[in-house]
């Protein structure tokens, strides 16, 4: 059940990322990495009003980042992110 909720949240997050307007500027089309460009934070929360087993600390404060070059430290790869025509790795901790 937890896996289903997590996957549903990730799918909704992917749709939200794709719904953002596409901005084609020279900065986005550069292949050079800019400082901080790969650290786009996304916060995902789980639970219902009455509380449930989904209120565990590990699922309540899931923080994800869209990174160019893979996950760092304690992060785990949880899919992909898209910004415009560029594809990033979604890393969550």
Swiss-Prot record:
It is found in: Secreted. Keywords: Antibiotic, Antimicrobial, Defensin, Disulfide bond, Secreted, Signal. Its main location: secreted. GO terms for biological process: defense response to bacterium. Residues 20-58 form a propeptide. The keyword Protein transport does not apply. Disulfide bonds join 64-92, 66-81, 71-91. GO terms for cellular component: extracellular space. InterPro entries: Alpha-defensin, Alpha-defensin_C, Alpha-defensin_N, Beta/alpha-defensin_C. It holds the Pfam family Defensin_propep. SMART domains: Defensin_propep, DEFSN. Paneth cells of the small bowel. It comes from the Eukaryota. The keyword Metal-binding does not apply. Residues 22-56 are annotated as: Disordered. Residues 1-19 form the signal peptide. PANTHER family: ALPHA-DEFENSIN 1, ALPHA-DEFENSIN 1-RELATED. Belongs to the alpha-defensin family. Probably contributes to the antimicrobial barrier function of the small bowel mucosa. This is Alpha-defensin 10. It comes from Mus musculus. The gene is Defa10.
């Amino acid at each position: 059940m937890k896996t289903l909720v997590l996957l549903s949240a990730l799918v909704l997050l992917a749709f939200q990322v794709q719904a953002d307007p596409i901005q084609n500027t020279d900065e986005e089309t550069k292949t050079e990495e800019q400082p901080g460009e790969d650290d786009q934070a996304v916060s995902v929360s789980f639970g219902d009003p009455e509380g449930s087993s989904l209120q565990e600390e590990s699922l309540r404060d899931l923080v994800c980042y869209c990174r160019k070059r893979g996950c760092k430290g304690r992060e785990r790869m949880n899919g992909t992110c898209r910004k415009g025509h560029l594809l990033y790795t979604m890393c969550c901790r």
